Amino acid sequence: MANNAQGKQDMGTGSVKKLMVKMAVPALVGQVVNLLYNIVDRIYIGHIPEIGGAALTGVGLFTPILMLITAFAMLAGAGGAPRAAIAMGQGDKDKAEKIMGNCFTVLLILAALLTTVFYFTCPTLLRLFGASDVTLPYAVTYGRIYVLGCLSVLIVMGMNTFITTQGFASISMLTTVIGAVINIILDPILIFVLDMGVAGAALATVLSQVVSAVWILLFLTGKKTILKLKVPNMKIQGPIILPCLALGISSFVMVSTESILSISFTSSLARFGGDVAVGAMTVLTSINQLITMPLSGICQGGQPLISFNYGARKYDRVKEAFFCQFGVCVAYTTAFWAVLMVLPNVFAGIFTSDAALVDYTAWALRIFLACGFSVGFQISCQQAFMALGQAKISLIMALLRKVFLLIPMIFILPLFFQNKAFAVFLAEPVSDLIAAAVTTFMFFRFFIRMMKEGKALQQS
């Protein structure tokens, strides 16, 4: 209790910059580890002799299915964990354990369904996404092996949140770190030493997820956990599971739109630019994550500080915390964007040794990320909306870029340009700039009004 009280006192009186660093660094480390998990396969695959470019393109085409699997995991995990936390806060541990058990059962059912559906429909879906005769074999090989490990993927993504919600943030982070380290070690062994190629990359990912899943289950059934995973609690009960799924719908929709966005890009680029354009998009997506994922870590550090002081009506500290978050996000994206614009070939070369793909990606990068500096404005303001309790406007601003701007522009802009592939890539910076301008304007209008009202309330 003393430590908890001290923590609250620090949030309200301690140095804002020091607190920001203290809270952002662990989140940033977690995001970087997640980033490695996401891109390490692609880096190794892109450097497989002779087939690297085609193999990388094939694996990139599987991304929409991977995102859909993630979305279903979020449906149970992102919806169930907060419900369990609320039950714990109410002192109802039994209900919290029933929530966790029910969510686990839902994940098992989803794993069986998704494995069956995606294993058999994989070739057809990948064709629809833009796979060619050259890239389809690599996409199917990677996809089917990954799908066979769907159970462990869902457990990791869906159940790790129940560890975090109990306050075991370090254990939760270790889940990701363990999987990432094993994946990084196994990738070169299976891909190059055992000469398994794309199949080796998929197997490395699945095995690392299996180890992470076992780690989670051992913890949730062990002595240290507060909430225990018990068989009797796994019986589905409507009043228990339905509120969890209802809460998880928002996260499900957000991740699902990423899948739709990925399909829109790959199918359009396959039509207008062929395999090399789709391969470039795979690399660009990974490079874009180098921009966006660290921003999430920075904002995760800033959110509790902004929220606490907003609740405590310490508006000067809210202002200081926001501008600290805003400044770091904008500085990072601007600096990284400048380096990308100067050295596009270097970054493209990290992911593949295919000369033609490197050259095309370097050309596409300067178009696709032309307004990459603006992402810092949009994400920092959107996340600040969330920190100030404005969840609805935050969701609208997040959907603005993807659903209302980017996806339509992918199909509209090629109507006005002779170089259709150029137009598809151009959809990204146009959407980024508009979304950043609108989000920043909306936030500062709200923020200035909030500060004035807050100061008036303090003086009255």
Question: How would you describe each model-predicted region?
Answer:
Residues V25, D41, G80, T121-C122, ...:
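Hydrophobic/aromatic residues in alpha-helical transmembrane segments
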Residues V32, L36-L56, L126-D133, I189-M196, ...:
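Helix-terminus/linker motif at the lipid-water interface of multi-pass membrane proteins
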Residues Y146-T164, S172-A180, A201-V214, S296-C299, ...:
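Short runs within selected transmembrane alpha-helices of multi-pass transporters and secretion channels
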Residues M11-I51, P64-G79, R83, L108-T115, ...:
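N-terminal transmembrane alpha-helices
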Residues M1-P26, A84-L151, V193-G248, I306-C371, ...:
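Short alpha-helical transmembrane segments in multi-pass integral membrane proteins
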Residues I45-M67, V134-Y138, V198-A199, I240-L247, ...:
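Interfacial/gating helices of multi-pass transporter permease domains
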